Amino acid sequence: MKVISSEIVISAVAPKQYPENGLPEIALAGRSNVGKSSTVNTILKRRKLARVSASPGKTRTINFYIVNNEFHIVDLPGYGYAKVSKGEKETWGKMMETYLSSRKNLYEVILLVDIRHEPTADDKMMYDWIKHYGYGSIVIATKSDKISRGAYQKHFKMIREKLGMSPEDKIIPISSLKREGIDKLWHSIEEIFIANNLPITIEEAEEY
């Protein structure tokens, strides 16, 4: 995928704020501080498009980014941060459920987990939730530069077993720091567009 343009459309807290242009959407979900904002910036080739916060749990909105004026990448609010109140957790849950259950132009929800660590109970709950709505064929393993390539398979096995992934589901290791794995992720997203006969322009990307 050649990213020619990418911009934030809106940071939404309610369905009435969601874009109404009907463009296909690919959403990213993950724990606070798993590296979602860094991943968004890297795949969209914009260093500061998504704000990278030093304080986990800051993302309280659903952020819609338009890519090449053809589709949206959607950054869902992070979860699993201990210092948020019960009320905030309930608000997060309602926001996520509303988006996942009602968005007709949503074609995939990709879960991000930290490749170094065993997925948490919250990760498992999120993955089951994503699967319930018919998504979850791709999991991104972030911060892949933090372990050796020789350890990948061991960590993939750990992630698959903890999440209960199907054999056909993919794990894509990504390093935002070294910009590794981006082409593979875009290729998998392109496959989703093609499988659904979506009119997305697919061009070979320049090196990330």
From Swiss-Prot:
Swiss-Prot/TrEMBL cofactor(s): Mg(2+)
Residues engaged in binding GTP: 30-37, 57-61, 75-78, 142-145, 174-176
Upper classification of the organism: Bacteria, Bacillati, Bacillota, Clostridia, Peptostreptococcales
Descriptive protein name: Probable GTP-binding protein EngB
PROSITE patterns: G_ENGB
UniProt cross-references to InterPro entries, sorted A to Z: G_ENGB_dom, GTP-bd, GTP-bd_ribosome_bio_YsxC, P-loop_NTPase, Small_GTP-bd
Function: Necessary for normal cell division and for the maintenance of normal septation.
A GO molecular function held by the record: metal ion binding
GO cellular component terms listed in the entry, alphabetical order: cytosol
Domain EngB-type G: 22-195
Key words, A-Z: Cell cycle, Cell division, GTP-binding, Magnesium, Metal-binding, Nucleotide-binding, Septation
Family of this protein: Belongs to the TRAFAC class TrmE-Era-EngA-EngB-Septin-like GTPase superfamily. EngB GTPase family.
HAMAP family, A to Z: GTPase_EngB
Gene3D superfamilies given in the database record: P-loop containing nucleotide triphosphate hydrolases
Source taxon at top rank: Bacteria
Residues that coordinate or bind Mg(2+): S37, T59
SUPFAM superfamilies (alphabetical): P-loop containing nucleoside triphosphate hydrolases
Gene Ontology terms: biological process: division septum assembly
Annotated signal peptide: none
